[in-house]
């Protein structure tokens, strides 16, 4: 299976609808989600993860950063910085924020993404 990234459909989700500066283009492929993200400078997922286990993202993400920089903080408190040109694996129990416009592609398990989206919609959907 293949598709030009520019042909991935816009994904409407809690995060793209409720967070300013978040654009998501994604498609479900088998048991994975292939998603291209554009995050504007200043995007911070931390307040939008309230209600998830430990108030952190429970989903693992594998990907590549095309442009920009993003920061990841894990449950144990350590932080990593992912820069343009880096491939990455971000395990469950993390938060993410960006200090500059950032674009990346990620691949994540569909069932875990669906559950995380459901929790966000249930706990934060009206905010």
Regions from the PLM with identified roles:
Residues 1-46, 52-54, 126-127:
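A short, N-terminal "cap"/entry segment at the start of jelly-roll beta-barrel domains
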Residues 24-26, 36, 62, 79, ...:
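Conserved hydrophobic/aromatic beta-strand scaffold that supports enzyme active sites
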Residues 32, 92-117:
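Ligand-binding loop in jelly-roll beta-barrel domains
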Residues 46-48, 83-84, 115-119:
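A short, polar/proline- and glycine-enriched secondary-structure boundary/capping micro-motif
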Residues 48-58, 80, 123:
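Vicinal oxygen chelate
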Residues 55-72:
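Short, conserved beta-strand element in jelly-roll/cupin
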Residues 74-94:
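Short acidic-glycine-tyrosine-enriched beta hairpin
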Residues 113-127:
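Acidic/histidine-enriched, glycine/proline-rich intrinsically disordered or flexible terminal extensions
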């Amino acid at each position: 299976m293949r598709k030009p990234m520019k042909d991935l459909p816009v994904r409407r989700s809690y995060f793209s609808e409720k967070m300013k500066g978040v654009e998501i283009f994604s498609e479900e492929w088998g048991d994975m989600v292939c998603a291209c993200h554009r995050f504007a400078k200043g995007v911070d997922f931390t307040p939008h993860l309230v209600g998830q286990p430990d108030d952190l993202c429970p989903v693992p993400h594998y990907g590549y950063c095309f442009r920009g920089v993003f920061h990841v903080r894990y449950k144990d408190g350590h932080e990593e910085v992912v820069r343009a040109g880096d491939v990455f694996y971000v395990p469950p129990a993390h938060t993410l924020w960006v200090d500059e416009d950032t674009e990346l592609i990620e691949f994540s398990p569909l069932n875990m993404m669906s559950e995380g989206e459901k929790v966000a919609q249930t706990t934060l959907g009206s905010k």
